């Protein structure tokens, strides 16, 4: 036989599992929990032993009726009221009653009017068809059995009496319909067969009632837990109240003891005899306690700390009802104003001010206010204001004081005052001059920084090309270096950093900048050219920077090379060879063929070893900007030379007047690196703007400090630029007036790197054309954009692009606005073009040229024409478009133009030498015989 678990039996019967377990234990079965198994016979015993009413209505078998042919048992049609009256009283537990009440649902409202109309219509139809009573009974019996089948699902959704009534209502409706004969006999037979099958099935489980029972059980458990939790919270609140009361009493005792001790120290007069105040005090305290609203509990009982619960007065319930009706935040405990409630609030204790000792030292800053000083020395501002008034200084607590006043005030208090040295966070130069910034114990040897200088086309880039084994020289426009480059090579296990500077005269500032950051200068002089102007300039820069010079005499492979002449010329400028007793090393090389290059590198390392070059790689990096430019995809790109410390990716950095974070870092070979030590040239991205070449940079501790320093430096630079106003004085008054009369060529300069921008602007400003000057409206790094064209159109300027190109939008806008764009890659061409433009803007200058002379031989006066002078040309020629002067006795009488010129009777353009003719002069008729006519023209002078 199969076994059943107890919870399965409970589900079938429709009761809780614990009831089945208890019943099984009463019957003597060995079970422990609802998961225990029993035999089928024991399961039937448990089911049959349950009390009536425990199982659901669906599990009860229907009473059997006497079978009749073609008829089944018919349940009588009953009403809800009759069922409620005739139903036997069942013994149910409290939980089951609660479950039934929870599961009870309100039946849906019926449309009685529609039912009456349907019944009347069906009755009329039945009478018309002549249906008999037997047919009606059969239909009713079939429908009574079918209604249970058709409404089985509907009955299962209900619970308890409500579902039973609902099924009865539906059954009565179906009965009314089938009573009219609307269901066929075959449908009735099917209904009877289904009902018979359902009656033979086992007991059903009412899931709705079961769910309601579980819900009721959960609600009961939650109510018990809530009650327990509420009581625990109430007990905790009472404990806290007791502790607070105890602490208050202890504090009161301490206060009384302190007052008593203070009274004992002072001799007090004899107190008058007074009545004991203990009883009235207790009475007052009791009165106050009565006025306080008692603690509330959830069951509307008054809770006393030392006694049982008491029933609450109806007064509080009425107040709660009024409060709920008002729906307001009414608070009964709110203190009412008035003399009757003055005793409810305890008097505030008087706080005694703590005495603070004066500090021994006081560090002040210029401009501190009285309030700030009072806060620092723990004194009232009024006290300090009083002291200042006694010293003769009228001040308020928000007034700033100077350093002398603060020191006098501190002397009066007996405090030693010292002025605080303020550190300018925006000052980058302090890192370069502060000796304490570097750790002397962490100093290590660093690579030398070598700057290659010399005249243009003397072979500087070719030497670097040979050293780096690359074709840098062929990539330069016009064969000259346009901007500075930094490279690093390795020789004998040691690194050397090279800086390449341009040799053209326009790049003076770049050469000076290179000399300021270098350790050794390699001066290249061509053996066939000798010392040139830029060679002398490089010598002066190196001497000004105090940098040792190594002379590399290049192009010794040429037939006309003369190294001895170069050595002698350099000696005249203070560069003396060690062979001649000087301190400069000379090396004869051929950069083109790589001759003596190793000797040059060894000489550089030897001089570097003598110089003892060291750096501290442990500090935050500082250094100098070698070059800066704007890249279309990367933004601002700066080439930096790290001089001290180590530069890392993501370091917050301040460069010149801008700031940023090192986003990416590449070395001279274009490879990405994460760190760069001393003497390493790197290219970084991540700056907000392109800095100026030659600016110093420093790494800060965090991005916030770097941002503050960068913004402050930019602000100061802007203020400094605005302060550079030219004031008119007696000394420069003439120059100012002359400048107002001069013509101006406005230019906008855009270049690829910052060094080229500076060099180009300086070169254009040096162009000397009398009467014309160059005005650089704007200069920047990057491509020519629309804003440049707009500015050029507004200022009537020419846009010069050096190694850059305009964007398509800028080019289209320039064509529309008729703005001229000049693109160049060689600085010579730019200077020549601007110089020609400046000369073309001058007003033309004319020079007087005498072309002929004539003598008046006869005069003729003609009406409406004037005086006609007959002349003979004595020198040169007289032309029709020439001007004429009338000279009489060596004095110019009139200067004007010829009105007509004739040879005999014909109008001619000119009359040659020794020929005769006639002429008239505009607006002059006083021509006399022997007057000399001098003919001249004005010729333009070429500049």
UniProtKB/Swiss-Prot annotation:
Main location: cytoplasm
Region (G1): 454-461
Cell compartment(s), UniProt: Cytoplasm
Residues where GTP binds: 454-461, 500-504, 554-557
A molecular function GO annotation: GTP binding
Region (Disordered): 30-357
Compositional bias annotation for Basic and acidic residues: 69-82, 112-137, 145-155, 163-196, 224-253, 296-309
InterPro entries: EF-G-like_DII (IPR053905), IF2_II (IPR044145), IF2_N (IPR006847), P-loop_NTPase (IPR027417), Small_GTP-bd (IPR005225), T_Tr_GTP-bd_dom (IPR000795), TF_IF2_bacterial-like (IPR000178), TIF_IF2 (IPR015760)
Keywords assigned: Cytoplasm, GTP-binding, Initiation factor, Nucleotide-binding, Protein biosynthesis
Segments forming domain tr-type G: 445-614
GO terms for cellular component: cytosol
Region of interest (G2), residue spans: 479-483
Keyword Glycoprotein tagged: no
Domain of life: Bacteria
Regions of compositional bias (Low complexity) in chain numbering: 254-266, 313-332
Region described as G4: 554-557
Region (G5): 590-592
Region ranges (G3): 500-503
Family label: Belongs to the TRAFAC class translation factor GTPase superfamily. Classic translation factor GTPase family. IF-2 subfamily.
Record function comment: One of the essential components for the initiation of protein synthesis. Protects formylmethionyl-tRNA from spontaneous hydrolysis and promotes its binding to the 30S ribosomal subunits. Also involved in the hydrolysis of GTP during the formation of the 70S ribosomal complex.
Designated name of the protein: Translation initiation factor IF-2
Organism ancestry: Bacteria, Bacillati, Bacillota, Bacilli, Lactobacillales
